[in-house]
Amino acid sequence: MNYFELFKFPPAFDIDTALLAERYRELQRAVHPDKFANDTEQQKLLSVQRTAQVNDGFQTLKDPIRRAEHMLSLRGIELSHETTTVKDTGFLMQQMEWREALEDIRDSADPQASIDELYQSFAEYREQLTQQLTQLLTSEQAEDALLAADQVRKLKFMAKLHDELTRVEDALLD
């Protein structure tokens, strides 16, 4: 299913999330099972299925990584359950530096400053990846779609690392 079509958006990485939320509420009202309470069992079942599609579409389009994965899946590149790793040595080196910095936080003289530095480093790198991804996803070239898939893999790693940093920060606050 093409969630961009469902929500009446052109397939683009940058979307208006406020408009997405508005269209989500409109679709929810239109397909909500309560609206079909007095209809046939088949209509009720269709309503439940449509509601699930609307919910999944909303969750997919509101999350930048899932949105990019969906765009790539529409072009025949499936990333959601893959195990392919990033081969970019520069990124792998940066990843190792971030992991070392994460491990060193607890022993740091100023753990909060170390956490803030890592958040800043993540944000800057993620912004670069997102800009590159936006350009690659607008291209019609098959090679650019494969490069976009690599950017998504990197963003997925960044999201995991960000979650780890948040857990470390939460543990220090406890």
From Swiss-Prot:
Keywords: Chaperone. Co-chaperone involved in the maturation of iron-sulfur cluster-containing proteins. Seems to help targeting proteins to be folded toward HscA. SUPFAM superfamilies: Chaperone J-domain (SSF46565), HSC20 (HSCB), C-terminal oligomerisation domain (SSF47144). GO terms for molecular function: ATPase activator activity; protein-folding chaperone binding. This is Co-chaperone protein HscB homolog. It holds the Pfam family HSCB_C. PROSITE patterns: DNAJ_2. The keyword Chaperone applies. GO terms for cellular component: iron-sulfur cluster transfer complex. The keyword Glycoprotein does not apply. GO terms for biological process: [2Fe-2S] cluster assembly; protein complex oligomerization; protein folding. Belongs to the HscB family. Interacts with HscA and stimulates its ATPase activity. CDD domains: DnaJ. InterPro entries: DnaJ_domain, HscB, HscB_C_sf, HscB_oligo_C, J_dom_sf. Residues 2-74 form the J domain. It comes from Shewanella baltica (strain OS195).
